[in-house]
Amino acid sequence: MIKRVILFLATNLAVLLVLSISMRLLGIESLLNQQGTDLNLNALLIFAAIIGFSGSLISLAISKFTAKRLTGAQVIERPRSTTEVWLLETVQRHARMAGIGMPEVAIYASPEPNAFATGWNRNAALVAVSSGLLEQMNQNEVEAVLGHEISHVANGDMVTLALIQGVVNTFVIFLARIIGHLVDRVVFKTERGYGPAFFITTLIAQTVLAILASLIVLWFSRQREFRADAGGAQLAGKEKMIAALERLGRMAQEGLPEQLQAFGIAGGERSQGWKRLFMSHPPIEERIAALRAEH
């Protein structure tokens, strides 16, 4: 996890440095100064990086607590049924095969079949399944779903997604404030401090840029689902993974709070055109086709 954080922080700093140098070489910084914008790009870059990463990393750090509160998930401390015993044994076996520590295992009350994994540390994660999943799927299918979630943990997907979100947040904040400065100083000729135009323009620009930037995060989310499916197939068996996805494809795919939808196994209803860009999961039929294509 530490290596992953260092890599992404270094990448982000490198990109910020390149962006800063590029703006100077292209004369954008001097142009802004000539227009009287009095904008310190280096300070703005640092500010944007701090704010951009703080939110995503804090969210990651408290992700297990948040997930439990949002779903009402109850961690299995002492199994009270054969189903709970089987869940713990299956997760433990998958975790050992994947080379990670034993995660917490929880069940949350929901009629919708779903499951999710979260946590900042791959050796101290949380895997939760809905009561609907246990009621509507057989053991082989549930085993595959658990393998899918364990693969998310083993791949470090939660950490990577949070860091990508941090990079995206940084650029959204940075560019939105540059646009706000330009409009406020150049168009409305504000000489001291910030006028209403800065705040209004920055808010609008940040909203638009955040929507566009979310496409990057959602694209990554869709790619990691294919990887988790492949990992689930390795842990539980390809046919079990395909059967689980086929069963999910025939069921309703709701039930998780919005903050956790990207971490659930269900999702990815059939969508056409531009709507596909805003999906956190690929369509079920594409995920099944990808598994069938693997040898």
Swiss-Prot record:
CDD domains: M48B_HtpX_like. Its EC number is 3.4.24.-. The chain crosses the membrane at residues 5-25, 43-63, 159-179, 198-218. Keywords: Cell inner membrane, Cell membrane, Hydrolase, Membrane, Metal-binding, Metalloprotease, Protease, Transmembrane, Transmembrane helix, Zinc. One of its GO terms (cellular component) is plasma membrane. It is an enzyme of class 3 (hydrolase). The active site is at E149. Zn(2+) binds at H148, H152, E225. Binds 1 zinc ion per subunit. It is found in: Cell inner membrane. InterPro entries: HtpX_protease (IPR050083), Pept_M48_protease_HtpX (IPR022919), Peptidase_M48 (IPR001915). GO terms for molecular function: metalloendopeptidase activity; zinc ion binding. It is a multi-pass membrane protein. It holds the Pfam family Peptidase_M48. Its cofactor is Zn(2+). GO terms for biological process: proteolysis. Belongs to the peptidase M48B family. This is Protease HtpX. The lineage of its organism: Bacteria, Pseudomonadati, Pseudomonadota, Gammaproteobacteria, Chromatiales.
